[in-house]
């Protein structure tokens, strides 16, 4: 045995024993009678280390010794002793000459890194990039690649990698389905053109996103898809949420009670929502009449009686919820199928506690939900004849500013920006948004906490920007050099280089002051300009060309209704004629009322199919399993004196 080989083996043994020296020794039992049975030794890490020692002592075969030591490292991983396995592999790897052994050792090392920590993906990526071949370990390599892609939220690439793993087929099918559902329709369509092996999943995901809100067409498309992929695990084990959706009936909102504050301090907000609901109601009536007339004309031309499947007219009634107790509101809605509202959180909490379970509620605000909120399965049971109990069906729709902040954080991360700083006005709403942004940002492993600056007024704003961008320090250094130099010094302030994005939570007036200050504070010597992002609170439809110039290069999110070139131009023209001086806040509440009414028939299916979205005036809306509605807003950017739309996330 060479001296170096002996040292390697001794160190490997030491690594193995170092973590077991403190373990409790088992009491030896006296064997009274020798057994004639021959039992197979347990092939644990100790077994493989013993084999390595004994085999090498006899044969001096380095290859076989290394094989046993690698199996010992593998066994240590199985025994949940990854620290010990890593130490052994780091000692052993310099001695490995066979490429298969190198690949095996690197795989065990990478797997142990991920078992021990969520912050080692960079190490694992380097290990996988340096593999010289798969050598029969393709399934394990694919599993590691899938984990890397999940960490980067690259769901399509994760699904591609998962196909080559050796996990159970049904579990693999279900996992791929869950991951691909995180893609939007555009991403799915693009993937369908290139990823032939994922066709069953991609096609079904596209069918759900395109047709799930049109039950007859959805059923037809689903049957066609099943016939194209007979025998595929996704067909034989159709996703549970789709099975539930097929058994559900849409909400039949025959009589709707709307609870809004139509008097008192919230009267303006309540009236704006009411007008949005009425606009949607009247639009539905016109659409129904046009459809009915077309059906009648078709029937007359063919001489056949054609049954009409058009939506029946709904009865809708508005009640003033101001200064009313939950008991009074409950009495008002006793003869109605669906309740839309109330708007005030306290009233929502009190009303949901006493509202009969046969009433469907779409509250116009979001409240803290209890843990016993009914699940999708319970709601499904309640819609079947076998159910012996009723479950309350409640939904919650709000224009929550925190949702915008969370979307903004994810958007910036998708842009591969890693060090934003945040400026927020000194008021409760913008500070809540800043807190939500930072909390979402830090959910990503190893994310650097953004610096947060709160400003109180315009003067304070200028000081805070100068301090946060280190411009004040740069000015101070220039003055010091001027004092020391005997000649005239020409200096240009430089801003800090460690940030790559600026986030603003402020109103349009504050943003119009902030943006030029930030622009003036940025050094012309910088390699690239800093991106400036904001929420919908920084934009107003009343901004003229001069005001927009102050916001140039600002990227922000807002509901489609507030942006140019949306799909509801006739409705926008009517509202402008009726309310030419309406404030932005009331315009947004009008859009909320419009969407709330139109969402009613589809709420149940949206809740069952969490990946499904409904596009409305307020954004792309989905419903989570607790009945809470969430919005995704489109992105826009101010280019000189106009607003241009950007691609959705």
Where are these regions (language model features)?
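Segments of small-molecule ligand-sensing domains
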Residues: 536, 578-645
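Extracellular/periplasmic periplasmic-binding protein-like sensory domains
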Residues: 377-382, 391, 399, 474-476, ...
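Short beta-strand segments enriched in small/hydrophobic residues
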Residues: 250-272, 420-422
